[in-house]
From Swiss-Prot:
Protein name from the UniProt record: Probable cobalt-precorrin-6B C(15)-methyltransferase (decarboxylating)
Reaction(s) the record says it catalyses: Co-precorrin-6B + S-adenosyl-L-methionine = Co-precorrin-7 + S-adenosyl-L-homocysteine + CO2
EC number from the UniProt entry: 2.1.1.196
Keyword Cell cycle: no
GO molecular function: cobalt-precorrin-6B C5-methyltransferase activity; protein methyltransferase activity
Gene: cbiT
UniProt family annotation: Belongs to the methyltransferase superfamily. Archaeal-type CbiT family.
Protein source organism: Pyrobaculum calidifontis (strain DSM 21063 / JCM 11548 / VA1)
Gene3D superfamilies: Vaccinia Virus protein VP39
């Protein structure tokens, strides 16, 4: 399958998914990708790739000659990422990396763009490792808890980086008989830092 559009936001249902493997939803993914300011032929590290939705869309946007390092410790997540990359014709640009962040980041080539999908308790260490691996670039992290937001902002402050925080609330309409009911997704904080 090819995605014929130049804009991000591949519908969630077009990605292969599995129970327990997280996916950055289309609306949040679109904003995160725009915050990354991806370039043709660029290099992105997707930490906690899950289903690979960000990896796939980034590879499509950056085009031929680009590299996306899709990092996850979960073998099932990496297999989903592989299948989704194949489905959308970008398997040649997506490199699967099994390992735990932040340690595994030291094994990767330098990149000027990092996307962190979650990170949990390791989020501050992941941010610090990413900054150490780039001369100049952008880090975008999506988090859902206030604790993760606080940890990320504190880590960025300690590093002296400029950053911005955007909170996104998404509700999708669902038909219920004659009516359309708006169903909310979890609010997400998108943290963008400039190194």
């Amino acid at each position: 399958m090819t995605w014929p559009y130049a804009t991000p936001g591949i519908p969630d249902e077009l990605f292969e998914r599995a129970e327990g493997v997280p996916m950055t939803k289309a609306e949040v993914r679109s904003v995160a990708l725009s915050k990354l300011r991806l370039r043709r032929g660029g290099v992105l590290v997707d930490v906690g790739c899950g289903t690979g939705s960000v990896s796939v869309e980034a590879a499509l946007i950056m085009g031929e000659g680009s590299r996306v390092y899709a990092v996850d410790y979960d073998e099932e997540a990496l297999m989903l990422t592989k299948r989704n990359a194949e489905k959308f014709g970008v398997a040649d640009r997506v490199v699967l990396v099994r390992g735990k962040a932040p340690e595994v980041l030291a094994e990767l080539p330098k990149a000027d763009r990092y996307f962190v999908g979650g990170g949990g308790l390791e989020l501050p260490a992941i941010i610090k490792a990413a900054v150490e691996r780039m001369e100049k670039g952008i880090i975008v992290a999506d988090v859902v808890t206030l604790e993760s937001l606080k940890a990320a902002v504190e880590a960025l402050g300690e590093l002296g980086l400029d950053y911005e925080v955007t909170q996104i609330f998404v509700a999708r309409g669902q038909r219920k008989g004659r009516y359309t009911v708006m169903t909310a997704l979890n609010p997400v904080y998108i943290i963008t830092a400039y190194a």
